[in-house]
């Protein structure tokens, strides 16, 4: 159980990160999937960041050096897109720009698993997935997944996430009923969010994009920036659900609530605990 002072510290940190994103409007390159581009871009815009959905391998050498951070999502991976992902990730790492890997449905094919393992070799700052994705990626074995949804709770994946963090050097974020963030030693739980968010496609992809924006303004505190992004997205979902009639209207309210988040609401609603 967190002490009140620790909880206040998390809450003030979350607000500070969101304020910095709004003030600095970091340029975030997203090489993401066809399904998620719209929601990812609008999530980033509503948080105050500047999204760029640039994915052509021809443009990487010219464009990527100018970004503040990179998001790579393999949701609709093809052999044509993989070189772009690798080129951008390699350049981001060389230039010490933070980047996030979202290994969507990583175990659905050998091609996808191999691609994600190759991307991990390029040193992502954060690896963000659901429980099944993190378990499959951690063991580098083919598991049974249900599309990009998760058949494992996030808490089931804690040990796999810690192992993956230690082997990859990345902070690992596991989305679920309780979001888990670990650097291999510390384990933080983010208890914000709502179940209905799982009924909207691309919310996980959008969360990865938001994490990238927060890393762009605080790359020296990767775990804390990741926790802040997950808390902010969860709070926006909670507020949105209170106004929504179902998933379609929640999608709209999620973006509006993220855009309108104020200090009082954030400080009151952040629910973060240390799990280990």
From Swiss-Prot:
Binding residues for substrate: 53, 202
SS bond partners: none
Gene ablation phenotype (knockout): No visible phenotype.
Enzyme Commission code: 2.7.1.50
InterPro entries named in the record: Hyethyz_kinase (IPR000417), Ribokinase-like (IPR029056)
Reaction it catalyzes: 5-(2-hydroxyethyl)-4-methylthiazole + ATP = 4-methyl-5-(2-phosphooxyethyl)-thiazole + ADP + H(+)
Keywords assigned by UniProt, alphabetized: ATP-binding, Kinase, Magnesium, Metal-binding, Nucleotide-binding, Thiamine biosynthesis, Transferase
GO biological process: thiamine biosynthetic process; thiamine diphosphate biosynthetic process; thiamine salvage
Enzyme class label: transferase
HAMAP family registered for this protein in UniProt: Thz_kinase
Role: Thiazole kinase involved in thiamine salvage pathway.
Protein name: Hydroxyethylthiazole kinase
Protein's organism: Arabidopsis thaliana (Mouse-ear cress)
Upper classification of the organism: Eukaryota, Viridiplantae, Streptophyta, Embryophyta, Tracheophyta
């Amino acid at each position: 159980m967190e002490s009140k002072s620790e909880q206040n510290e998390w809450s003030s940190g979350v607000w500070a990160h969101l304020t910095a994103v709004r003030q600095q409007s970091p340029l975030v390159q997203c090489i993401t999937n066809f399904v998620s581009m719209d929601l990812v871009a609008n999530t980033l815009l509503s948080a105050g960041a500047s999204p760029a959905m640039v994915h052509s391998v021809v443009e990487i050498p010219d464009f990527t050096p100018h970004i503040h951070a990179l998001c790579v999502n393999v949701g609709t991976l093809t052999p044509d897109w993989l070189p772009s992902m690798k080129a951008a990730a390699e350049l981001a790492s060389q230039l010490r720009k933070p980047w996030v890997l979202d290994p969507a449905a990583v175990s659905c094919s050998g091609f996808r698993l191999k691609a994600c393992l190759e991307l991990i070799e390029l040193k992502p700052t954060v690896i963000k997935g659901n429980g099944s994705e993190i378990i499959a990626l951690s063991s580098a074995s083919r598991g049974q997944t249900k599309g990009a949804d998760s058949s494992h709770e996030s808490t089931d994946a804690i040990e796999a996430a810690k192992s993956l963090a230690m082997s990859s050097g990345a902070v690992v974020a596991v989305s679920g009923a309780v979001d888990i963030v670990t650097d291999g030693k510390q384990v933080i739980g983010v208890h914000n969010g709502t179940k209905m968010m799982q009924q909207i496609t691309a919310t996980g992809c959008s969360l990865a994009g938001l994490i990238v924006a927060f890393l762009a303004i605080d790359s020296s505190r990767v775990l804390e920036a990741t926790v802040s992004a997950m808390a902010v997205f969860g709070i926006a979902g909670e507020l949105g659900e209170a106004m929504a009639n179902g998933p379609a209207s929640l999608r709209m309210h999620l973006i509006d609530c993220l855009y309108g988040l104020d200090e009082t609401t954030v400080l009151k609603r952040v629910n973060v605990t240390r799990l280990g």
